[in-house]
Amino acid sequence: MTAALHLIRLPVDVGALSRWAGERRLGLTDGGGFDDGRALHHLLSETFGKGRLQPFRLLVPPGRGGRGSLYAYCRTDAAALREEALAVAPPEHLNVVDLPALADKPMPGDWRAGRRLGFEIRARPVRRLLAPLAAGPGNGPGNGPAAGTGGRPFAKGDEVDAFLVAALRRLPDADGGTALSRESVYAGWLAERLAGAATLTAVRLASFRRHAASRKGNRRGAVTLDGPDALLQGELEVGDPDAFRLALEKGVGRHRAYGFGMLLLRPVSPDRAAERPADRAGERGGC
């Protein structure tokens, strides 16, 4: 029998995490930044087992003095995770997390097709190119979609912001048409990845920033990858229950092992919960 999926909450001392990572030179990025996702990737793997708490999301409320909550989906309950950490984790790892306060709840195992849910996801909406892509004239430095690329072409295999890819692939005669929006491009990107599992009925780009990610290089050391960091909020309808369960467990998109791609579920807003699916048929088509 397959173990139930659990939602895990683990309190994290963000200051202690930064010190722990600094001693190991983990998460440092070009320009002196710090990628807490890579630090947490290593900390969680060494404390609970590789890939066990994944996907995950770290939430740090303002004014909490560096105390955060890490949420993750896992096929192991809190008691078993605590037992594993006490057996194998070094003492310095347990100074970063509050192991006694680790908590869990079992997730439903019988999702109903058509059920409406609110969601929030921190995503890295990128596309890996299957062929080279030119940056295009006038799309390098400045404030345009390709700002910061220096006008250089992208090579096959490059990981590129989905919004930038969409902007560069637009037909020349589309210049006078409706301008692309980052929100609509990212909504389409998410809809593609949830196809079959869920249908998006509303999507909002709640926040966006550029994010410098520290990742293992081909040789010893690390490389810095710049990319989008988007917080998407909205509502969905469950499609295939098994596919939806898998989307929760595995996460959505790339960099799922580093703090991206976790679907956190929320209540549907009361006004929208009262609507019939047919009332929003046209709205779904826009996402």
Where in this protein do the model-derived segments appear?
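RNA-interacting cores
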Residues: M1-C287
